[in-house]
């Protein structure tokens, strides 16, 4: 493939102007897995690069509280947050959702779990003596105390009461988007279909699902109105290195996203999928913030630069980093 004309360092920086990173992990975090920067630093760096907004993700806290504070001290910039339904919040917990809706700046998203989905937690583990072993096999305590508390989405039949209540809460607050979280592709398909049934207008298929789903499954979800998320972190050097992403117990260090050998595929594959799905159906972000990666602004610039090298036009990139995130966030 001939490299496209016009690609340059300057162009990748120019395309940050007005951009939105919908997946930023800023501090604080657990001692054994510090963050690269704090939320105020993240906002200041994004603003100084000309970006329009960032969305904070936090596996332990309602990040809309963080957004409320940052918005008070960083002028001329917007940050958003929401709730990830991990076990620290009781998993499938309608009370947590009710609270998040009215807390701080108000939740902008509700995610159905990250490391606390059964699909991911059951597959998290690390290589021991040359063989991948799930944490649930290494530590019976993990299975009893963590795995059994994790979120599962029934793929058929009526939603259980807690899921029904949460979907009703999201539907009643149209400023909030549903984030599938790190569920299985089958569970994500079910959530997208349920969103349509409940009248939920904004849905994001999390990048953890995007890495696992087939192209046909992604096409189905996009055809039903969901945005498909691609994040650069899934394709970096740090992904297959065990870390304490969520659990404070150091023995629970695991490979990111629960992949037996780390995330498979490449950024080229992601680019091919975006082309096939259509950039109008996709959003890119970084999922950066971990201390082994660059700061999120640089991560987004690198993602943009790679897409330019892979033949995406500046207009396509603007769809992915500006127009579509604005639509998801209801920014007009």
Spans of model-derived segments:
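An N-terminally biased module of ancient metal coordination in phosphate/nucleic-acid-related enzymes
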Residues: 1-78
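Histidine/acidic residue-rich metal-binding segments in metalloenzymes
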Residues: 4-17, 40-44, 64-69, 94-108, ...
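Hydrophobic faces of well-ordered beta-strands that scaffold small-molecule active sites
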Residues: 18-24, 54-56, 80-83, 108-112, ...
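Active-site mouth loops of central-metabolism enzymes
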Residues: 22-37, 81-91, 153-158, 181
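Active-site beta-loop-alpha junctions enriched in small/polar residues
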Residues: 25-27, 59, 82-88, 113-117, ...
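A generic, well-ordered mixed alpha/beta core segment in the N-terminal half of proteins
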Residues: 77-123, 127
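Short acidic/histidine-rich active-site segments
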Residues: 231, 277-296
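Mid-to-C-terminal alpha-helical segments outside catalytic/metal-binding sites
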Residues: 297-332
């Amino acid at each position: 493939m001939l490299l496209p004309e016009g690609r340059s360092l300057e162009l990748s920086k120019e395309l940050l102007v007005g951009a939105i990173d919908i997946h930023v992990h800023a501090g604080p975090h657990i001692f054994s897995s510090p963050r690269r920067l704090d939320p105020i630093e993240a906002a200041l760096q994004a603003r100084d690069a000309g970006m329009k907004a960032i969305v904070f993700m936090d596996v332990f806290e309602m990040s809309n509280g963080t957004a409320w504070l940052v918005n008070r001290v960083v002028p001329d910039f917007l940050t958003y947050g929401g709730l990830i339904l991990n076990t620290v919040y009781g998993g499938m917990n309608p009370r947590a959702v009710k609270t998040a809706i009215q807390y701080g700046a108000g939740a902008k998203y509700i995610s159905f779990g990250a490391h606390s989905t059964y699909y991911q937690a059951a597959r998290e583990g690390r290589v021991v003596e040359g063989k991948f072993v799930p944490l649930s096999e290494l530590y019976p305590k993990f299975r009893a105390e963590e795995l059994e508390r994790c979120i599962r989405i029934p793929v058929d039949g009526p939603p259980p009461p807690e899921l029904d209540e949460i979907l009703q809460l999201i539907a009643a607050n149209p400023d909030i988007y549903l984030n599938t979280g790190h569920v299985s592709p089958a569970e994500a398909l079910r959530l997208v279909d349920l969103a349509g049934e409940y009248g939920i207008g904004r849905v994001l298929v999390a990048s953890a699902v995007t890495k696992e789903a087939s192209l046909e499954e992604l096409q189905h979800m996009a055809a039903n109105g969901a945005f498909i998320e691609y994040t650069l972190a899934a394709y970096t050097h740090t992904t297959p290195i065990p870390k304490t992403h969520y659990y404070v117990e150091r023995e629970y260090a695991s490979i990111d996203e629960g992949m037996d050998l780390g995330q498979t595929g490449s950024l080229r594959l992601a680019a091919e999928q975006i082309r096939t799905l259509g950039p109008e159906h996709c959003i890119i972000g970084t999922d950066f913030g971990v201390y082994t990666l660059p700061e999120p602004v640089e991560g987004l610039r690198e993602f943009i630069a790679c897409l330019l090298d892979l033949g995406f036009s500046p207009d396509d990139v603007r769809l992915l980093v500006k127009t579509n995130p604005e639509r998801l966030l209801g920014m007009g």
